């Protein structure tokens, strides 16, 4: 399992948008390298959260939580370059499970062991997150599943470093 990045990991507060974007893209390249290594050793790699992580900047802008789409645009350029260099790739399969708001609130109320910082913000990201992965699935059907699979899925997927796929996916997204 390739874990999500530590929530306390942050770029320098004085970093520019470009520096901040490069910081996050580098961290995600490290996660991708770990996933590729695990896949080579174990024939499969599972990542907690999409290694591209580009969805976060886009969903923030789409939900109106970041008034500018500048972070998304900056990261988009860097990530496209990472795909070209094969230091980041598109996950072969994405399980995008977005519980309803009522389920999220029930889980929160029933689990006092977690603080769930930014809970309200994350609730607002649910719809844009689904839009993000609907766009991917529309250009590469079957790459996204909407519930946890019972068994590993197989089947031919488009190349994980396919720039045409990436561009078609980005073109399919609603505007921010």
Feature-to-residue mapping (PLM):
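Residue-level detector of flexible, active-site-proximal loop/helix-junction positions
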Residues: 8, 53, 152
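Surface-exposed beta-strand edges and their flanking turn/coil or helix-capping segments
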Residues: 16, 60-61, 158-161
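Well-ordered, non-membrane alpha-helical segments in soluble/globular domains
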Residues: 21-30, 68-82, 119-131, 162-167
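ATP-dependent NMP and nucleoside kinases share a basic, alpha-helical "lid"
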Residues: 36, 47-115
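NTP-dependent small-molecule kinase module
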Residues: 109-176
């Amino acid at each position: 399992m390739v874990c999500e990045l530590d929530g306390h990991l942050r770029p320098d507060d004085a970093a520019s948008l470009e520096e901040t974007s490069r910081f996050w893209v580098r961290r995600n390249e490290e996660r991708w390298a770990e996933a590729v290594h695990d896949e080579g050793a174990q024939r499969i790699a599972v990542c907690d959260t999409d290694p591209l992580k580009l969805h976060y900047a886009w969903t923030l802008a789409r939900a109106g939580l970041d008034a500018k789409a500048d972070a998304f645009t900056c990261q988009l350029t860097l990530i496209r370059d990472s795909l070209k260099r094969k230091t980041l790739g598109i996950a072969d399969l994405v399980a995008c499970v977005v519980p309803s708001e009522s389920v999220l609130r029930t889980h929160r109320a029933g689990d006092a062991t977690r603080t769930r910082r930014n809970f309200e913000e994350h609730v607002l990201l649910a719809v844009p997150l689904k839009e993000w992965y609907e766009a991917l699935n529309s250009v590469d059907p079957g790459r996204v599943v909407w519930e946890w699979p019972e068994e590993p899925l197989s089947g031919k997927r488009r190349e994980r470093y396919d720039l045409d796929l990436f561009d078609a996916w980005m073109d399919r997204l609603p505007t921010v």
